[in-house]
Curated annotation (Swiss-Prot):
Binding-site residues for L-glutamine, renumbered to this chain: 68, 213
Alphabetical list of SUPFAM superfamilies matching this protein: Nucleotidylyl transferase (SSF52374), Ribosomal protein L25-like (SSF50715)
GO BP term, example: glutamyl-tRNA aminoacylation
Keywords of this entry: Aminoacyl-tRNA synthetase, ATP-binding, Cytoplasm, Ligase, Nucleotide-binding, Protein biosynthesis
Similarity comment: Belongs to the class-I aminoacyl-tRNA synthetase family.
Record's keyword annotation contains Oxidoreductase: no
Gene name, Swiss-Prot/TrEMBL: glnS
Name of this protein: Glutamine--tRNA ligase
Short sequence motif 'HIGH' region: positions: 35-45
Transmembrane parts of this sequence: none
Binding locations of ATP: 36-38, 42-48, 232, 262-263
Reaction(s) this enzyme catalyzes, per UniProt: tRNA(Gln) + L-glutamine + ATP = L-glutaminyl-tRNA(Gln) + AMP + diphosphate
Native source organism of the sequence: Pseudomonas aeruginosa (strain LESB58)
Residues spanned by motif 'KMSKS' region: 269-273
EC number: 6.1.1.18
Amino acid sequence: MSKPETTAAPNFLRQIVQADLDAGKHAKIVTRFPPEPNGYLHIGHAKSICLNFGLAQEFAGDCHLRFDDTNPAKEDQEYIDAIEADIKWLGFQWSGEVCYASNYFDQLHAWAIELIKAGKAFVCDLGPEEMREYRGTLTEPGRNSPYRDRSVEENLDLFARMKAGEFPDGARSLRAKIDMGSPNMNLRDPILYRIRHAHHHQTGDKWCIYPSYDFTHGQSDAIEGITHSICTLEFEDHRPLYEWFLANLPVPAQPRQYEFSRLNLNYTVTSKRKLKQLVDEGHVSGWDDPRMSTLSGYRRRGYTPESIRNFCEMIGVNRASGVVDIGMLEFSIRDHLDATAPRAMCVLKPLKVVITNYPEGQVENLELPRHPKEDMGVRVLPFGRELFIDAGDFEEVPPAGYKRLIPGGEVRLRGSYVIRADEAIKDADGNIVELRCSYDPDTLGKNPEGRKVKGVIHWVPAEGSVECEVRLYDRLFRSANPEKAEEGGSFLDNINADSLQVLTGCRAEPSLGQANPEDRFQFEREGYFVADLKDSRPGKPVFNRTVTLRDSWGQG
């Protein structure tokens, strides 16, 4: 794709924060990032992380990490650990200790009792289906629950018995008493507490009733002194409820909620439920599979924190919903790796070359720059009689415009000599297994006199090169809108069957043999690659393709 504008895109929240500070509303701004620990963070979360932590950094404020752990059945310590690691990897550090909504369960319970005593909450016996019927629709008002007019005393008694574990899951709930005729569905007597007999990763078995997200969120913000509670647009309709709770409870502060548009990328699924389905059903190797849209997946793919932060800055922050072209994210990593990744050569499909006129036993150590622009020093390649080129760089019957090696033709080996193909050796099945070539000793670093050699190909020495595994990753979905499936189908029907190709027996230049996990390179003519975080180790490298050198999808 064409190069996007790299200047910072508009951010209306930056302007709001600046105006609030200028007006003296807050001595210091405090933001928060409140993930639910029921899955790994994905690329959409990166936008929220960069926004909340970025605003706190820019305006010398604080940003809290708070786990919204109100649904113990779906939460796990594994997710908590992964979320903390992802935030740190992105380059951010939360202020103070990690917070948990469960830290405030006692206070939330006390406030629920205050609402009951004020006649603003009641215990309801309606089940989920009945409650849905009573709730009404967007065009029809709801109906009051038959239990709405219970006395304060009865509600206090029932709520205490709910807490004591007397009733089974789903038998009763505590609801706010607001307005069943409100055009805003969130104000139609929303649930404050549900019965869930589930072990909690932080509080153990202390509780069998758990507060709803809506009852927890604003009060947690108030307890922590959050000044700017920033959510995605789907929570805009929840703001009146957020404000109702703050107005009807003796909270220590009055935070303000703001909304921005969430990140939607084409060719990408970010639903935690669907990401979990991909993992559970074995369509990918795990939450950190390099094809996943999780931050741990992007990290293992070879994306850098800088590239993701830059991408989030490029797309900006606004309230307009839309779909961002994944090409912008791919541009961001290409741009960063082009400037920072050392160059190296790796032959993915090796074809042996014997240079018949090169002296046997002789080896020259050729110095090649590690980067064409930056001063990264040099790497040394031993050049001898035998080497490997890519099988795709020789054609007996070349197509039009082919500029690589052909019978009797010449090419330059990158950083080395010009060679000519003299003979192709084949096996019994007619497959080319070796090339016999000759070299021009006067062409090291210069063109031969009277001949113009157009093609340049990469190579590695036969002796000293390192055998490696290379994993060619591509987009997991072949459809720009993978959520859109044929009638009766699912998003799984849009999985790209060619999203992973594993190549073994590849040959890398000697300098790559000691690559450490997460070392990144540009393999010349092949793309940008990273030594795999889990499977690669010095002496037995495994490289993942991060991104191609150019946007090949845009040419289709």
